[in-house]
Amino acid sequence: MPLHLYPDVYASGSVPPGWIPTKGGTIKYPVRNPAVRRHLRELLPGRWQKVIKQGNRGEVHYFEHNSGQVAGVKYYAN
């Protein structure tokens, strides 16, 4: 599974220019899939969370490390 680390969601290239997160539109929960969690911890040891962020023109889904780095960024247009 090809997950790459990025400093933020915009650096991944998946989020279109002009996308702005909606205030209060963020859901965070622990990574439940053991295989994905194991792979993420191989990339960067520590705590990872699954994040779903609502924005002005769609949603962004990604995994976030405690350090703020992200992986597996996907954009879904509304």
Please name every model-derived segment:
Residues M1-N78:
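Catalytic toxin/effector domains delivered as secreted proteins or via bacterial secretion systems
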